[in-house]
Curated annotation (Swiss-Prot):
Listed name of the protein: Adenine phosphoribosyltransferase
Enzyme class: transferase
Cell location: Cytoplasm
Biological process per Gene Ontology, one example term: adenine salvage
Gene: apt
Keywords: Cytoplasm, Glycosyltransferase, Purine salvage, Transferase
Organism of provenance: Rhodococcus jostii (strain RHA1)
Length: 177
């Protein structure tokens, strides 16, 4: 088992909590202070990278996952693919839609030009809530021929059930609330 205590301490110390944001009854975890603290960011990136040192590619989820994914890819010497929200990439794209609480959303990656076929991918994002975005990301990169070897997040909100939704994939969360 990998010791994530330094990262866990940094996340616990630096995360800013905002009540009733973006709507009443929601408690939002703002990880921006973690990213802006050089030592905090470094230990978080190191801990996420340790989850799958054999990863060929990091799939970084739009938008805060981009910050983490680039750092993890740099640490591992692997590539990084930005998994974008719909409409941000020119065609052709591969897409995966998923259900939100009130509607649907779609994620996209370039079709054919990023060479994911047969490659080992670690999916990285900041927060695991319901698991919809991360599940869609994993299915999207699998549709490109990649093998998802794990999902790694900084913070997991356990009460929202995302871990169960991602049960097929090895999951690492640095902090669970």
């Amino acid at each position: 088992m990998i010791d994530h205590s330094s990262a866990r301490d940094a996340v616990t110390r630096l995360t800013r909590w905002a009540d009733d944001f973006p709507q009443p009854g929601v408690r939002f975890a703002d990880l921006t202070p973690v990213f802006s603290d050089a030592d905090g960011f470094r230990v978080v990136v190191d801990a996420l990278a340790a989850c799958a040192p054999e990863a060929d590619v990091i799939a970084a989820v739009d938008a805060r996952g981009f910050l983490l994914g680039g750092g993890v890819a740099r640490e591992l010497g692997s590539g990084v693919v930005a998994v974008r929200k719909s409409g941000k990439l020119p065609p052709p794209v591969l897409s995966q839609s998923y259900t939100l609480e009130y509607g649907t959303a779609t994620l996209e990656i370039p079709a054919g030009s990023i060479g994911l076929d047969g490659r080992s991918v670690l999916v990285v994002d900041d927060v695991l809530a319901t698991g919809g975005t991360l599940d869609a990301t994993a299915r999207l990169v699998e549709s490109a021929g990649a093998r998802v070897i794990g999902v790694a997040v900084v913070l997991e909100i356990a009460a929202l059930g995302g871990r169960e939704r991602l049960g097929k994939y090895p999951l690492t969360s640095l902090v669970t609330v």
